[in-house]
């Protein structure tokens, strides 16, 4: 298992919401936990993954996601079991929609 940490610049999401969880930890899938944190200018991301050596891929996927969604001020905790970048984007989008109550 590899543990990665990122701080990503994004537009702030200004909602007072309870934490949410989306997805499941299973083969080819991942779980996303979304909560707020006190730094309004960055999104904190922690990734625990079974796929070792893909930090650059995670960085690219997360940067692209943060450009499409306002996520600064949030903490994203991802528990991954080999999800593809497309599945990561899907789960992140679902988790943010759930957090926003959409």
Swiss-Prot record:
Its main location: cytoplasm. It is found in: Cytoplasm. Keywords: Cytoplasm, Phosphoprotein. The gene is mdcC. The modification O-(phosphoribosyl dephospho-coenzyme A)serine is found at residue 27. This is Malonate decarboxylase acyl carrier protein. The lineage of its organism: Bacteria, Pseudomonadati, Pseudomonadota, Gammaproteobacteria, Moraxellales. GO terms for molecular function: acyl carrier activity. Covalently binds the prosthetic group of malonate decarboxylase. Transmembrane segments: none annotated.
């Amino acid at each position: 298992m590899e543990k990665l940490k990122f701080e990503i610049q994004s537009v702030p999401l200004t909602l007072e919401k309870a934490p949410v969880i989306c997805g499941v930890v299973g083969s080819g899938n991942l779980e996303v936990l979304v909560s707020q944190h006190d730094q309004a200018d960055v999104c904190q991301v922690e990734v625990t993954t079974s796929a070792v050596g893909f930090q650059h891929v995670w960085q690219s996927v997360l940067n692209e996601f943060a450009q499409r969604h306002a996520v600064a001020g949030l903490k994203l905790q991802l528990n991954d079991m080999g999800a593809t970048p497309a599945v990561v984007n899907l789960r992140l989008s679902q988790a943010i929609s759930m957090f926003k109550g959409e």
